[in-house]
Regions:
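Substrate-binding/catalytic cleft of secreted carbohydrate-active enzymes
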Residues: 1-175
């Protein structure tokens, strides 16, 4: 589903330095029960609309909106409605540490633009889900210069699933 909430903290908090934003990112929407019905409605509509499309192999909960009760409920609904497909949500890592979060309905651990060392830390540590890059190698300028490093890492670790290159296009100004 196209649930995206880049920076709602700007509207809610006077102290918007990065540490404060990161620590409280999930409070305004993702971990706010008042948004459960809205998030669930959007997820339901997407899944019901696209359930018969053969190209859909993974349900994504959205992009960069943090994690909390709204997405826990949405994931539970998705799994009850369509258990045949995998689920992922890149923003599941963005929580506030104030409670124990439910990740049981997530099948994949997904990230955007991690370093190779960050990936290795998850895989060699306590990571309990296959690792997938839901966005990497943004093709802007010389951004994709790390493709070979990622490919070698994918090939040498059985619990990686590869990834999805974000925007395989050139954003340079045409002259």
């Amino acid at each position: 589903a196209d649930i995206e909430a880049h920076g709602p903290s700007e509207l809610f908090y006077s102290d918007n330095n990065w540490d404060n934003k990161a620590a409280r990112w999930n409070e305004p929407i993702a971990n706010n029960p008042e948004f459960c019905e809205s998030i669930l409605d959007r997820i339901r509509r997407c899944v019901i609309r696209d359930k018969n499309r053969a190209s859909v192999v993974i349900w994504s909960m959205g992009n960069e909106s943090a994690y909390g009760v709204t997405f826990e409920e949405a994931l539970a609904w998705v799994k009850s409605y369509d258990s045949s497909r995998l689920t992922h949500y890149e923003s599941a890592q963005y929580t506030d540490g104030k409670r124990k979060y439910d990740y049981s309905n997530l099948d994949l651990y997904s990230r955007m633009y991690p370093s190779i060392s960050e990936m290795a830390e998850y895989i060699d540590g306590d990571g309990d889900k296959p690792y997938i890059l839901c966005e990497y190698c943004h093709a802007m300028g010389n951004g994709p210069g790390d493709l070979e490093d990622y490919f070698q890492f994918f090939d040498s670790h059985e619990t990686t699933c590869g990834g999805f290159v974000w925007e395989w296009c050139d954003h340079a100004i045409y002259r």
